[in-house]
Amino acid sequence: MAFFLIFLSSFFGLCIFCTALLRWNQVKYNQKNLPPGTMGWPLFGETTEFLKLGPSFMKNQRARYGSFFKSHILGCPTIVSMDSELNRYILVNEAKGLVPGYPQSMIDILGKCNIAAVNGSAHKYMRGALLSLISPTMIRDQLLPKIDEFMRSHLTNWDNKVIDIQEKTNKMAFLSSLKQIAGIESTSLAQEFMSEFFNLVLGTLSLPINLPNTNYHRGFQARKIIVNLLRTLIEERRASKEIQHDMLGYLMNEEATRFKLTDDEMIDLIITILYSGYETVSTTSMMAVKYLHDHPKVLEELRKEHMAIREKKKPEDPIDYNDYRSMRFTRAVILETSRLATIVNGVLRKTTQDMEINGYIIPKGWRIYVYTRELNYDPRLYPDPYSFNPWRWMDKSLEHQNSFLVFGGGTRQCPGKELGVAEISTFLHYFVTKYRWEEIGGDKLMKFPRVEAPNGLRIRVSAH
């Protein structure tokens, strides 16, 4: 009986303590002129609910508090904006104090010189260096031939096999980028890079708690290893004095570029290119295969476009820049895949001073999460929004609407958009002209916080 009374007292005491803690945290952030919303627990806030429920959490909060509300997610107090006009205002006003506000874990692991972490003149310089590597001329003359060569090799010997298309597209996105950046082929060095890189990616999506066995710790350790690998590569190239025709070679060739980067800046830029291209290229490619399987008429139209290109060529001829530019329906498939799968859920900004937005005062240092996911399913923008309909993108103006934020917006719009589209287009070209496929079935897809198949997405491939 005494034990039961002690247990009961402890239980009620814990309930009272938790209630008081929640109340204290709410009062702490109940400042005048802040948007409505809830803040959850101290330190952790509402991160658990956000990551677990994702879109449902956002919809519930919007139903209660409107399209502009406060929360505490990803380790910091955050304002969530789900209003298209406000989103655009936030994205185009970096000069007024709305700078990138990516999680500390991402900044720590991608490096202090990465393009997402720097502002002002430093951002302009680093962005200029990046754009010089992936300009239309570079894509046409240097990168597309490398991509074509890689895709031909990567898609060899898939006939009569069951493959995990998620695993294949993950490797494809990483190894293709590594070939373009540093000329590294499928060697032991590439494998070492890849295993550490996957740890790095998971680390950027975690709370910055540097304890053993946490994703953040593994990601940070992976960064150290990758930095050492890249530093060794730079030193070896500098010692050999041989100019390599890849991105790293271009950055190191002082006569070829006006952007003079330090070794640390080059390393962070390379890691950023690998990171930013990996998630979008791999996941969009996987989901395109999924959607094409589920929509035979779309696949028929896409295959028709690519067979027309192949009919003009010898079997061994690569695709060139003019071929890529002619792939209008392919581009439509990629854009529709990006919209419907929602590879990118939103964009983070941070206030550098107290700011008035939408009639509220947002304190200095708060994050603003421009949550763009719901825009992708707005029937006013996309009739029948949950259907996979690439033909809607044959109207070129749709891609340039202010509401289309899959590739970001403002001065931070994704600089690698065209390179990514070129990679996915080349993959689809060889995949649909060489193979047919059917799903094995039973594989689960998750759409939040990342689009992924936890147990893989298996398909049975046969020659076309």
From Swiss-Prot:
Source organism superkingdom: Eukaryota
Gene Ontology biological-process entries: brassinosteroid biosynthetic process; brassinosteroid homeostasis
Ranges that cross the membrane: 2-22
PROSITE patterns given in the database record: CYTOCHROME_P450
UniProt-listed Gene3D superfamilies: Cytochrome P450
Pfam family name, one: p450
Pathway: Plant hormone biosynthesis; brassinosteroid biosynthesis
Cofactor(s) listed in the protein's UniProt record: heme
Location of the protein in the cell: Membrane
EC number: 1.14.14.-
Tissues expressing the protein: Expressed in sub-meristematic regions of shoot and root apexes, in zones undergoing lateral root formation, in fruits, and in all flower parts, with a high expression in young flower buds and at the joint in the pedicel.
The protein's role, per its UniProt record: Catalyzes the C6-oxidation step in brassinosteroids biosynthesis. Converts 6-deoxocastasterone (6-deoxoCS) to castasterone (CS). May also convert 6-deoxoteasterone (6-deoxoTE) to teasterone (TE), 3-dehydro-6-deoxoteasterone (6-deoxo3DT, 6-deoxo3DHT) to 3-dehydroteasterone (3DT, 3-DHT), and 6-deoxotyphasterol (6-deoxoTY) to typhasterol (TY), but not castasterone (CS) to brassinolide (BL).
PANTHER family: CYTOCHROME P450 26, CYTOCHROME P450 85A1
Recorded family membership: Belongs to the cytochrome P450 family.
Protein name per Swiss-Prot or TrEMBL: Cytochrome P450 85A1
